[in-house]
């Protein structure tokens, strides 16, 4: 089975090359630095499958071009699949497989790191000390111990975040359509309105769907406690950015930590340090002293990358052998 990898970085080579050389997987890999889109889809000619990341264009026109060059399988080396037109994939005869849970702890740990960095002004403190300024002005934060955390979405990542918050000595509230029995004794499930009104730290861990888009908006922000901490390591579209910026200007939040944000496509994972940034969202958000923005890196640990590689190759092997596809995504 020949797999064409799109949007690859050096670390992809490091973790996938070893597995590709293993006869157990029986795969040949061709790495492309170009990301998957309508222009690059024809480069998959001669392959059986393509492998793409969360920032790839997997819309209907792209999938149609992949099908035209003989691609039968789309391997997502990520958990999210809201960038994939599943109906078009089915119509084109392309099987979609994903990595449902590579290291939930990695993302949850980053979420707590963002919460603390924003709350305790770690970035500002670092810059001050670098400039030999050891004054404490502007660095006042809040205790997490004894406060309440609100976890929106209690899948694997949300559950990991709940356990972290519990370990910090926080009262943990949770909202999800489905209760996670593994969290019995750790969280108390409540309605979203109660969570927003009660929690001192709100962390988003739900998928981006029609129902969850802008789950954080003008109205839900008004429900939140003043000086709450808001963290998003899930999908940028969960937060209405304009509403968030207005709330920050009104000094609503003690801190905001974002690993994702709206309209990050075309910018995420790229280096624009020598360019003029065209996206206005990040500069505005970074102008607030209590906001910390990172580059969609919550997943980015050695443990997670190894797990992603193994599961992706196992998905490819199962497809090639006609075995049960436990990680298939259907429309």
Q: Positions of the model-derived regions?
A:
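Short glycine-/small-residue-rich Rossmann-like dinucleotide-binding loops
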Residues: 54-55, 200, 206-208, 234-235, ...
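Structural alpha-helical scaffold elements that stabilize or flank donor/cofactor-binding regions
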Residues: 42-43, 194-195, 220, 284-285
């Amino acid at each position: 089975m020949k797999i064409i990898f799109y949007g690859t970085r050096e670390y992809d080579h490091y973790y996938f090359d070893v597995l590709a050389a293993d006869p157990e997987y029986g795969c040949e890999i061709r790495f492309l630095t170009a990301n998957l889109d309508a222009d690059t889809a024809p480069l998959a000619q001669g392959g059986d499958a393509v492998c793409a990341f969360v920032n790839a264009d997997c819309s209907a026109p792209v999938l149609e071009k992949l099908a035209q060059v003989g691609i039968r399988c789309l391997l997502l080396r990520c958990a999210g699949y809201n960038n994939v037109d599943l109906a078009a994939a089915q119509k084109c005869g392309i099987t979609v497989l994903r990595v449902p849970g590579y290291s939930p702890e990695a993302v949850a740990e980053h979420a707590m790191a963002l919460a603390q960095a924003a709350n305790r002004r770690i970035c500002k403190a670092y810059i001050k000390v670098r400039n030999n300024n050891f004054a404490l002005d502007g660095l006042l934060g809040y205790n997490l111990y004894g406060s309440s955390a609100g976890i929106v979405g209690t899948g694997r990542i949300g559950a990991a975040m709940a356990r972290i918050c519990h370990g910090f000595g926080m009262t943990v509230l949770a909202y999800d359509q489905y209760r996670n029995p593994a969290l019995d004794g750790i969280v108390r499930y409540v309605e979203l309105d109660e969570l927003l009104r009660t929690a001192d730290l709100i962390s988003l861990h739900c998928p981006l769907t029609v129902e969850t888009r802008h789950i954080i908006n003008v109205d839900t922000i008004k429900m939140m406690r003043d000086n709450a901490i808001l963290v998003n390591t899930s999908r940028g579209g969960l937060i209405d950015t304009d509403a968030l910026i207005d709330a920050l200007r009104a000094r609503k939040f003690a801190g905001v930590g974002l690993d994702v944000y709206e309209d990050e496509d075309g910018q995420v994972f790229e280096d624009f340090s020598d360019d003029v940034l065209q996206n206005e969202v990040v500069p505005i958000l970074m102008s607030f002293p209590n906001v910390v923005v990172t580059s969609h890196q919550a997943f980015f640990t050695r443990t997670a990358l190894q797990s992603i590689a193994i599961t992706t190759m196992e998905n490819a092997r199962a497809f090639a052998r006609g075995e049960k596809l436990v990680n298939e995504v259907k429309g």
